[in-house]
Amino acid sequence: MKKLLIVIGLLFIVVWGYAQKPNYERMANTVMDKVVVESKFTTKKGLKWTYDLGVPLEGVFEVWRTTANETYFSFVKKWMDKYIDKEGNILNYSAEEYNIDHVKNGKVLLALFKATNDKRYLNACHRLFAQMQSHPRTNEGGFWHKKIYPNQMWLDGLYMAQPFLSEYADLMQKPELYDDIVNQFVWMEKNAKDAKTGLLYHGWDESRKERWSNSKTGLSPHFWGRGMGWFVFALVDVLDYFPSSHPGHNKIVAILQRTIKAVAKYQDPKTGVWYDVVDLADREGNYLEASASSMFTYAMAKGVRQGFLDKKYLKSIKKAHAGLVNEFVEEVSPTHINLNKVVAVSGLGGTKNYRDGSFEYYMSEPVVANDPKGVGPFMLADIEFERLKNQSAMSKSTHVILDNNSNTESKDSKKLLDNFQERISSARVSANAY
């Protein structure tokens, strides 16, 4: 009987291991079943146009590109089609709000246009671009975070708009946009960077009128993890479509290098991940946070893979990826996982329950499982880690041997990626014909 139980146990382990999908795919399944559901995006006015939708959908779209499983593509398209009508109008979107968060979903729309050549998605992107053409700015030219937050630049805002604008400029052949894209990062770093740590403060108020802002510097009090995460996320994604021949390209790379150097110093040596308030690991109440840790892992892995960051970070990346799994991932089944310890939201100011940017404020926000702002970056970080690992293996040997948990790119997936690149080329032609 004892031997039989041992055999059954071993068979269970083998079957579980054989059936288990890569973590990015298991996370995508959780997103489709539990995260991106209508009940979470429906308000009294109907479906809400929010970056909380675009962040996980971008992750699911990349899972489609990696696996060639049409289920993931269909899910992304189905959700965007709830918002985009036949003319490319966006449901419950108001450009006049001048909310930079609302531009983020344009990345998903651009991806769908390239995949389908359906001009509805491109027309919707034109509307988002039009918002940014008249979006309020600081005196030197930085985009306000929102009209209701005048004179303020937040780290979050760089992620919400600049990757979209970079890809839009590439698609629509608008090289005149690149200088402005570079300057947004230059100004953010100049105004928000701490000389001692190299980290960037969450927000900067040019007017110095906000209660959270320092009367001399205009800066918020702390280095928020996900804010820093949004910033490095934006840097590596902007570079996807930013021409290397442009003089601003090296400026973006240099900002990425400086910022990652600073972030790497605060990686928790025990777990490999990062704290919610990055530099205060020993402060009572501070906690290891999943979304920021996923974003840092993603930016480091992608930066090294694309040659923008030194390979000296490989050890940190490996430790960070292991930390994501060990510290935050909860096993559900061979096809699903949960992502724990994601801060639901953190901001600055406002009219109700004013957010003063204090340490106590950041610690007061709820920490949840499977928040959209965590699961999206986690999928992308997991994919980037596998791509980097495969690239490293290829550079060492023409005969690639990966461990059982690695995703080896299938012929179907390779064909899909090649076809997608062809679609991008044809999309440029189509885009400029509309």
List the predicted regions and their residue ranges.
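Oxyanion-binding "anion nests"
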Residues: 232-281, 285
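Asp-box/WD-like beta-propeller blade repeats and closely related beta-sheet repeat scaffolds
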Residues: 121-160
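Bacterial Sec-dependent N-terminal signal peptides
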Residues: 1-22, 425-434
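Loop-centered beta-sheet repeat module
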Residues: 178-239
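Alpha-helical scaffold segments in carbohydrate-active enzymes
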Residues: 30, 34, 59-62, 82, ...
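Carbohydrate-binding/catalytic loop surfaces
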Residues: 58-61, 99-112, 143-157, 198-223, ...
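Inter-helical turn/loop segments and adjacent helix faces that build the functional surface
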Residues: 67, 168-179, 238-250, 303-311
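CBM-like carbohydrate-recognition segments
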Residues: 22-54, 66-73, 82-100, 106-108, ...
